[in-house]
Amino acid sequence: MPPGRWHAARSAQVSREQGCLRMVKEEEEDGYISMQTARPQTLNRPGQELFRQLFRQLRYHESSGPLETLSRLQELCRWWMRPDVLSKAQMLELLVLEQFLSILPGELRTWVQLHCPESGAEVVALLEELQRDLDGTPLKDPCLTQNPDVHWIGTSALQPAQIWSPASHLKNSSALEDHLETSHGIGICDVLAEQTDSPAVSVPDYFQLEEGIEYQEALTFQDVEVTFSQEEWGCLNSAQRNLYRDVILENYGNVVSVVGSSPKPALISWLEARKPWGVNICTVQLKRDADAAPEGGKLQIKPNKFILKQKPSEYIEACVKTSVSPETSVSEETGLKESFKQKSRLQTSCGDSIQMKEMKEGADISQRTGRESEVLRNNDILELKHVKCVSVSRKRLSFKHGYDRNFRKSSHHYNNKYGEGLRGTGEGFGVYQNTGLKENGKDRYGETSRKSWHAHPEHRQPSYSEEGLFQCRVCGKAFKWRSNRIRHEKIHTGVKPYQCSLCEKAFQRLSSYRLHQKTHSKQKRGSSKYKNALTCSLDVSHHLTDRDERKHLHCNQCGKNFSCKSYAIEHQRIHTQEKPYKCTRCRKTFRWKSNFSRHMKLHHKEVYKQEKRQEDFKQSYRQSQVISTVEKTFPCQNCGKTFTQKKSLIEHQRIHTGEKPYQCSGCGETFTYRSSYIIHMKRTQHAIKIKPEHGCLTFSQGAVFPIPRGSHNTEGSNKCKYCGKAFHNRSFLLIHERVHTREKPYQCRECEKAFRWSSNLYRHQRKHFLHKRYKYRESKETSNLQSKILIDQKPFWCQECGKTFTRKRSLLDHKGIHSGERRFKCNLCEKSFDRNYRLVNHQRIHTTEQPQWRDKDFVGIHARSVDQRKHSNTLQSEYGLHSDKPGLSYCQDVRLNIQELSGKLRKECDNPSDESSKSIAFQNVPTKKKACHKCSTCGKTFKKHSHLISHKRCHTKERPFKCIVCGKTFRWSSNLTRHMKNHVRN
């Protein structure tokens, strides 16, 4: 705000006392950052009056065109009406008040405007009160016929016709003069002589004119001077400030042309010297005491309360420029005004002393916003002494930017007697840095400061707002750190200091600039222009380091640059899908070392758990060995083996004695151990058939003996209704019925294929798992064809012949053909075979088994019924466990026992006299199973449904098996397998 008088508008002062944010301008060595507050939410009546008159007196010829005229009118009306603060009713009241004042007589309008009414009701109240004081005499305008209405000067360029003529006098002035008093109790003459709390436009000093005073003395520059409050000045933009500057200078020129030459005011000197919005003004702030009187009363001024908010050298320069006359006038907002003469001796920060002239009445020393300071009541010599010259470097601007810092009272920077800041001198002045603390230790928000900090820049306290954060002065966004707020406010200012010298594109942030430079670095790498591309108003060339120039490793696929070779190699793995880290235990591969290390930790945990289990097992085994050595008190006299229990010793001795105390009542078989006897009895029950006519059970050899009746009912209750097959468990019956109902309850979630048995579903799901496993892992030793075969329905593939298998066990058995390994060995002749079924066929030679045919029924090992096989297993288990012939294996014992059983059956069948035994003998001989699946085309029958489906392909000519290499189709899977071998060999 330019220096000038401050009018004490009550609303403006209330807004300042409420702690409105101030405009802060931070000047740096290379530039400054401007941070402006939001619009004040309070009213300033003088400012509104100014914009009202500007709005009314605007002429069309003053603008360059209709659009500019309209926009200017809209802006002036907005500042007059203030729609952001006032409501519609209040704005309407302003229009009515203006019209009401315009139709009043000149005398009454002048007197009413001195009271600054805010509404029409206040004007009516003032007029009625004045009319009562005049004993009912109605007020008339005596100047209506003689002189035009009084023009309020101070808003636009003054014309000679607009000057108040002193020749016009009021009628009945003697009667009216006794009653025209202000609300503060000050006479009208005193008000016009000393009033600084007047509206924005002052009234000419008509009432204090004497008869002998000349015409030119009726008008001064103070009458046309208009100032703003600090908040309103901060809300003005550059165009509005230019308008204010032009109007004030033009008014001053008109006053000089009419009145004559006079001392140039400080406001005019300041406006002519520099722009009002780009610099900091020399500031002398009066420290106001908490005991100050309210508005309108006298302010108790205490001496030694001035604080200079600027360096002494800057203060001297500003005072020399602005102080033209030796008279210096310092006034306070309340309108009290005194003159004083003082000598000031200022010493600069570097030690040079400068003698200033006497400051007399006439010049202004004001704040940067133009507010006048209070008059000193003493004539003491003003002496400022800067304690120390502080040199601020570019890297450390904390002292320069350290606003709102609290100083510790014990520090030499604080003096409780003379105020805050640097060390106080004899006259009580101290230079400080806007600490925001009052004399009583409270900050500007009225809160007591609890934290104290050193004045050193390294021990500064962050300046927080009322919410504890740094708020943006434009949009109100809060930040935790002041640097973030400054960075954010660059968005509102629109400053883009980082400019590219190649394409002249500008950026607000250095990070965006560096990203932009990468586009040029691909085209012109190594160019000298790249080093000098950072051009801005600030010195930020140190941001470009050698690290940016060292990025010479370039990826050909994605265009990324790297400064280190190891980073580039790791980046290439993304494109090549290389996984160099391989686990030696599970053969898993990894692309990054971190993933491999994380995976190895899992193995280490497993090994640790396994080792711990082994240690626990060894420890428990050692403890058991210690216990067993003590408890083993029953030794065997034949072999020396010891036992902990006598029962175990008795069972062991049966081996040496050959005792078999357990005998089967059905077949007469004896057993050494009770467990073997129980197993035999369970298996014997499966070999028993029910004889309906006698209610007895018939053994397969022909023996008949009674059994409990519950067995017949249990077996008959779980009988298949389709084929009549009986089951002991109902769950087995339900599983069996799926063969007839074709039900497939097990469905795959991935391909929705259904299966009848859960084992088939499990085998099918393994294909999906292997498909995912081998899909992205192609072995280096196999070709693309081999990898496709691995992904096929049979993932286990033989590398020798190309044959595929669904199970790994089948593949291992198949590999024995190529390797020549013979794992199946006969215990009698020590002959080995590569297949198990070949060993079984070979062992028939040792059993001397001769299959025989009787009519269409085959009696032998290949035609045994299920009951005979189960019974033979029972006999074999007893014979194999306790036989003295160590040379016979399990399979051989089964064949020998079945041979004896078959001999007995043949003898019974050869005897034609015994019809019952013949029927019993052939009762257990299985007949040929009937084919139940018939082809509807040719009438051919099949035992299995799968065979029927394969047969139908002959009629439909369907070829479902397709080669994934050449696309050839086949009818049978065996043909496709044979065909795939040719591709593998090629």
Curated annotation (Swiss-Prot):
Intracellular or extracellular location(s): Nucleus
InterPro entries: KRAB, KRAB_dom_sf, SCAN_dom, SCAN_sf, Zinc_finger, Znf_C2H2_sf, Znf_C2H2_type
Disordered as annotated region, ranges: 433-460
One GO CC term, this protein: nucleus
Main location: nucleus
Zinc finger feature spans (C2H2-type): 470-492, 498-520, 553-575, 581-604, 634-656, 662-686, 718-740, 746-768, 796-818, 824-846, 933-955, 961-983
Cystine crosslinks: none
Keyword Oxidoreductase assigned: no
Domain SCAN box: 52-134
Family annotation (PROSITE patterns): KRAB, SCAN_BOX, ZINC_FINGER_C2H2_1, ZINC_FINGER_C2H2_2
GO biological process, one term: epigenetic programing of female pronucleus
Residue intervals of the KRAB domain: 219-289
Disruption phenotype: About one-third of zygotic mutants survived to adulthood. They do not exhibit any loss of methylation imprints at ICRs in the brain and liver at 12.5 dpc. Double zygotic mutations of ZFP57 and ZNF445 are embryonically lethal and embryos show no gross morphological abnormalities but significant reduction in size and weight at 11.5 dpc, a phenotype more pronounced than in ZFP57 mutant mice with a more severe loss of impinting.
Keyword list, A-Z: DNA-binding, Isopeptide bond, Metal-binding, Nucleus, Repeat, Transcription, Transcription regulation, Ubl conjugation, Zinc, Zinc-finger
Cross-link entry Glycyl lysine isopeptide (Lys-Gly) (interchain with G-Cter in SUMO2), positions: K302, K360, K385, K524, K609, K691, K929
Molecular-function annotations in GO: chromatin binding; double-stranded methylated DNA binding; zinc ion binding
Superkingdom assignment: Eukaryota
Compositionally skewed regions (Basic and acidic residues) per UniProt: 439-460
Gene3D superfamilies: 6.10.140.140, Classic Zinc Finger, DNA breaking-rejoining enzymes
Database matches in SUPFAM superfamilies: beta-beta-alpha zinc fingers, KRAB domain (Kruppel-associated box), Retrovirus capsid dimerization domain-like
Family: Belongs to the krueppel C2H2-type zinc-finger protein family.
Protein role: Transcription regulator required to maintain maternal and paternal gene imprinting, a process by which gene expression is restricted in a parent of origin-specific manner by epigenetic modification of genomic DNA and chromatin, including DNA methylation. Acts by controlling DNA methylation during the earliest multicellular stages of development at multiple imprinting control regions (ICRs). Acts together with ZFP57, but ZFP57 plays the predominant role in imprinting maintenance. In contrast, ZNF445 seems to be the major factor in human early embryonic imprinting maintenance.
Name the record gives this protein: Zinc finger protein 445
Species the sequence originates in: Mus musculus
Gene that this polypeptide is encoded by: Znf445
